[in-house]
């Protein structure tokens, strides 16, 4: 039997690597179980779906941010025929918040959506990868975890810390 060197066949040694696990911490809640401030944030996200411009996907997303100092900001997805030129609700809210309140840390975000039938989605939706990265940047600037409320009619998922949405995040430029 041959003995292969790691330097010659590194892919073969993947089989012998130690497996690791990640745990994602979240709570599954009803709207009524949320504290009043989070209920208000969810309602604002739901309202923001009404300002969405989604003539192509017909999927209307709203996001609401809670900033330091009890400031709330809402944003919605804005589509464009040149698909890459559109903006997600989460980034609309984040970028407006930072441009209008640059020193205020983001404390929480609620995200809600209306499907093609015009109704709020039964199940929670979650941010795309680009929005997750933008949320991580906001969390890094704030220096503390952001609470995330993923909203659906059936239940709401609450996470604390963007790392629970984005394991193995791109976290710094060397």
What are these regions (language model features)?
Residues 74-174:
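Zn2+-dependent cytidine deaminase-like catalytic core
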């Amino acid at each position: 039997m041959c003995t292969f060197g790691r330097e010659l066949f590194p892919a073969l040694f993947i089989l012998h690597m130690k497996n690791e696990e990640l745990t994602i911490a979240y709570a599954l809640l009803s709207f009524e179980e949320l504290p009043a401030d989070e209920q208000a944030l969810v309602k604002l996200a739901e309202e923001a779906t009404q300002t969405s411009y989604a003539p192509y996907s017909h999927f209307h997303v709203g996001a609401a941010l809670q900033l330091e100092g009890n400031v709330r900001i809402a944003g919605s997805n804005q589509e464009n025929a040149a698909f890459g030129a559109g903006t997600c609700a989460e980034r609309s809210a984040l970028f407006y918040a930072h441009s209008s309140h640059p020193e205020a840390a983001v404390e929480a975000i609620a995200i809600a959506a209306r499907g093609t039938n015009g109704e709020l989605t039964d199940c929670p939706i979650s941010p795309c990868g680009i929005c997750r990265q933008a949320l991580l940047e906001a969390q890094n600037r704030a220096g503390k975890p952001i609470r995330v409320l993923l909203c659906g009619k059936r239940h709401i998922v609450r996470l604390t810390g963007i790392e629970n949405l984005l394991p193995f995040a791109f976290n710094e430029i060397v």
